[in-house]
Design a protein with these regions (language model features):
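C-terminal peripheral helix-coil segments that are non-catalytic and often amphipathic
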Residues: 2-3, 139-144, 166-226
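Short, Lys/Arg-enriched anionic-surface-contact patches
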Residues: 7-15
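Helix-turn-helix
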Residues: 18, 22, 26-60, 64-65
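Alpha-helical DNA-contacting segments of helix-turn-helix folds
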Residues: 62-69, 127-130
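Hydrophobic alpha-helical connector segments
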Residues: 64, 77-111, 150
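Amphipathic alpha-helical packing segments from all-alpha helical-bundle domains
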Residues: 74-78, 119-147, 151-159, 187-190
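Short alpha-helical scaffolding segments that buttress acidic/His motifs in well-ordered protein cores
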Residues: 101, 115-118, 160, 164, ...
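Amphipathic alpha-helical segments used for helix-helix packing
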Residues: 102-125, 131, 169-175
């Protein structure tokens, strides 16, 4: 578990971040059921009263933590949510988006685990900004002439995200060097593209991806985090 330094309550912003950091560590380790305000407060180095001042209930703390993770994922994969708007399908670089998702998953397996556990427990997945944009973008793609007929955007979204977030766990990315993570990310992105290219996508519409799939693998370049 992450070793979180104690912070004084005199700095509310730093204290709030310390509490959220502790909550993220516990969520990644034990899931939502393993999070209590008292344990989070202890890990963050603050007293319970201070934790309750920032988050009145355990549920609000978990919700705030999940929102932070979702926003971080959104910025890393799609860009600034304040300026992105609804992207036109024809303008989306599918290979670049796939690469960004693969790199984020390889570099942040614990955050992806938090997000996935929270989404599975949510009564309304569409309330999550990252899921709404990811599934929504695939639905817009499925409705376009770039896709094969009959693509189920919801099922495809679950398949792609589950695979992207489980691969780093299988490959033990947390114990790998950066170069190894880049190579593992490339392998993941390559097979995601291959599955889509010859499944949901009309392959004749994507000559650049067809050409990429025919080349030898090279590690993914670093992508600036949002």
């Amino acid at each position: 578990m992450t070793d979180i330094r104690k912070r004084r309550a005199r700095d509310p912003v730093a204290t709030r971040e310390a509490i959220l950091e502790a909550a993220r560590a516990l969520l990644a380790k034990d899931g939502p059921d393993g999070v209590s305000l008292s344990e989070v407060a202890h890990l963050a180095g603050v007293n319970r009263g201070t934790a309750y001042q920032h988050f009145e209930t355990r549920e609000k703390l978990i919700e705030a933590t999940a929102d932070w993770v979702s926003e971080r994922m959104f910025r890393s994969v799609f860009g600034d949510p304040e300026t992105i708007g609804e992207r036109r399908v024809e303008e989306v670089d599918i290979a670049d988006t796939t690469d960004r998702l693969a790199l984020f998953a390889m570099d942040n397996p614990e955050l992806c685990r938090i997000w996935l556990l929270q989404l599975l427990a949510s009564p309304d997945p569409m309330a999550d900004p990252f899921w709404r944009e990811y599934e929504g973008s695939l639905q817009r793609f499925a409705n376009s002439d770039l896709a094969e007929e009959g693509v189920d955007a919801e099922v495809l979204s679950v398949l792609m995200l589950a695979g992207a977030f489980l691969w780093p766990i299988w490959a033990r990315s947390h114990a790998r060097e950066e170069g190894e993570r880049r190579a593992l990310g490339r392998r993941l992105a390559q097979e995601c593209l291959r599955l889509c290219m010859f499944g949901s996508m009309r392959s004749d519409k994507f000559p650049d991806i067809a050409e990429r799939l025919g080349r030898p693998l090279a590690p993914l370049p670093r992508v600036a985090q949002g």
